[in-house]
């Protein structure tokens, strides 16, 4: 029988049976534990019911795995990024994009929150930044178009696993509560299934919703890229998609001659600040 991992606490796992749509606790087979197999939220598993309990027997192969937040098998990742309180940081956003896209997340969406806190000039500047990301191929949503974007996100969730991630205080929980009005009721049901108190977002939680799944993740402070310089270059999607035109096969887009990416930056076809952020990350990896 097949299930998804909704939540993990110690050595107990909350499973969602894909055929019956029921939720129940399970433990991991001793053999898997001895093999030091790590199970995380989003994992697809096979289970059986023995005389006393449900037992996880196998972890299916993952299509992707994130360490921060710790989740697996994501179809779409929505990065919630505040434009005010805390203020927008292009470096922070570009670092998140590089980190996630290096981990086989094919569909990464940017959501700018707290747009209503900007003054007129700040809004104008932010809209120019949004246009740059859209020009570079990203889907960008924002908190001013709540109802329209709600429909877009609900359509993304259907038959998919959508994960929301972002730093602490960016408004991620506000967005998820807007999308799922009965979220508290749903999390209460999960807490009851686990025989524990009210759930708070200190660990990742997968919620069945709209014929798909939403993953709510804890906020975090910063990320370590933990990759090589070439991996960094390839994790910038707009760079990777155009690097075929560079003179050198493994061009790092720094000091190389006839670098097509630098040419695109000079022609304002790639957001210049994004390129400067790339150079900063590149130098940090070099150190």
UniProtKB/Swiss-Prot annotation:
<keyword id="KW-0378">Hydrolase</keyword>
<keyword id="KW-0963">Cytoplasm</keyword>
<feature type="binding site">
    <location>
        <position position="246"/>
    </location>
    <ligand>
        <name>Zn(2+)</name>
    </ligand>
</feature>
<keyword id="KW-0690">Ribosome biogenesis</keyword>
<dbReference type="GO" id="GO:0019843">
    <property type="term" value="F:rRNA binding"/>
</dbReference>
<feature type="binding site">
    <location>
        <position position="259"/>
    </location>
    <ligand>
        <name>Zn(2+)</name>
    </ligand>
</feature>
<dbReference type="InterPro" id="IPR004881">
    <property type="entry name" value="Ribosome_biogen_GTPase_RsgA"/>
</dbReference>
<comment type="function">
    <text>One of several proteins that assist in the late maturation steps of the functional core of the 30S ribosomal subunit. Helps release RbfA from mature subunits. May play a role in the assembly of ribosomal proteins into the subunit. Circularly permuted GTPase that catalyzes slow GTP hydrolysis, GTPase activity is stimulated by the 30S ribosomal subunit.</text>
</comment>
<dbReference type="GO" id="GO:0046872">
    <property type="term" value="F:metal ion binding"/>
</dbReference>
<keyword id="KW-0694">RNA-binding</keyword>
<feature type="binding site">
    <location>
        <position position="253"/>
    </location>
    <ligand>
        <name>Zn(2+)</name>
    </ligand>
</feature>
<feature type="binding site">
    <location>
        <begin position="166"/>
        <end position="174"/>
    </location>
    <ligand>
        <name>GTP</name>
    </ligand>
</feature>
<dbReference type="GO" id="GO:0005525">
    <property type="term" value="F:GTP binding"/>
</dbReference>
<dbReference type="InterPro" id="IPR010914">
    <property type="entry name" value="RsgA_GTPase_dom"/>
</dbReference>
<comment type="similarity">
    <text>Belongs to the TRAFAC class YlqF/YawG GTPase family. RsgA subfamily.</text>
</comment>
<dbReference type="GO" id="GO:0003924">
    <property type="term" value="F:GTPase activity"/>
</dbReference>
<feature type="domain" description="CP-type G">
    <location>
        <begin position="63"/>
        <end position="223"/>
    </location>
</feature>
<dbReference type="InterPro" id="IPR030378">
    <property type="entry name" value="G_CP_dom"/>
</dbReference>
<dbReference type="Pfam" id="PF03193">
    <property type="entry name" value="RsgA_GTPase"/>
</dbReference>
<comment type="subunit">
    <text>Monomer. Associates with 30S ribosomal subunit, binds 16S rRNA.</text>
</comment>
<feature type="binding site">
    <location>
        <begin position="113"/>
        <end position="116"/>
    </location>
    <ligand>
        <name>GTP</name>
    </ligand>
</feature>
<keyword id="KW-0479">Metal-binding</keyword>
<feature type="binding site">
    <location>
        <position position="251"/>
    </location>
    <ligand>
        <name>Zn(2+)</name>
    </ligand>
</feature>
<dbReference type="GO" id="GO:0042274">
    <property type="term" value="P:ribosomal small subunit biogenesis"/>
</dbReference>
<protein>
    <recommendedName>
        <fullName>Small ribosomal subunit biogenesis GTPase RsgA</fullName>
        <ecNumber>3.6.1.-</ecNumber>
    </recommendedName>
</protein>
<dbReference type="InterPro" id="IPR027417">
    <property type="entry name" value="P-loop_NTPase"/>
</dbReference>
<keyword id="KW-0862">Zinc</keyword>
<dbReference type="GO" id="GO:0005737">
    <property type="term" value="C:cytoplasm"/>
</dbReference>
<keyword id="KW-0547">Nucleotide-binding</keyword>
<keyword id="KW-0342">GTP-binding</keyword>
<keyword id="KW-0699">rRNA-binding</keyword>
């Amino acid at each position: 029988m097949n299930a998804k991992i909704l939540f993990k606490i110690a050595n107990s796992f909350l499973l969602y049976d894909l055929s019956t749509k029921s939720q129940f606790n399970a433990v991991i087979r001793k053999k898997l534990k001895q093999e030091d197999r790590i199970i995380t939220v989003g994992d697809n598993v096979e289970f059986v019911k023995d005389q006393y309990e449900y037992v996880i027997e196998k972890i299916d192969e993952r299509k992707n795995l994130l360490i921060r937040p710790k989740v697996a098998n994501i179809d779409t990742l929505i990065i919630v990024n505040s434009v005010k309180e805390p203020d927008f940081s292009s470096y922070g956003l570009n670092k998140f994009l590089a980190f996630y896209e290096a981990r086989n997340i094919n569909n990464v969406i940017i959501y700018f929150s707290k747009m209503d806190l900007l003054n007129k000039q700040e809004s104008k500047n932010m809209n120019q930044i949004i246009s740059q990301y859209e020009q570079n191929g990203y889907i960008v949503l924002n908190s001013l178009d709540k109802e329209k974007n709600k429909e877009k996100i609900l359509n993304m969730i259907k038959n998919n696993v959508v994960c929301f991630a972002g730093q602490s205080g960016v408004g991620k929980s506000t967005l998820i509560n807007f999308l799922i009005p009965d979220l508290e009721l749903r999390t209460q049901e999960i807490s009851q299934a686990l025989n524990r108190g009210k759930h708070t977002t200190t660990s990742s939680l997968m919620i069945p919703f709209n014929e798909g799944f939403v993953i709510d993740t804890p906020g975090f402070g910063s990320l370590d890229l933990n990759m090589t310089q070439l991996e960094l270059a390839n994790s910038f999607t707009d760079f990777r998609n155009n690097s075929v035109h560079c003179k050198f096969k493994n061009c790092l887009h720094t000091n190389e001659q006839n670098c097509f990416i630098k040419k695109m930056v000079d022609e304002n076809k790639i957001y210049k600040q994004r390129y400067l952020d790339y150079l900063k990350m590149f130098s940090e990896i070099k150190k």
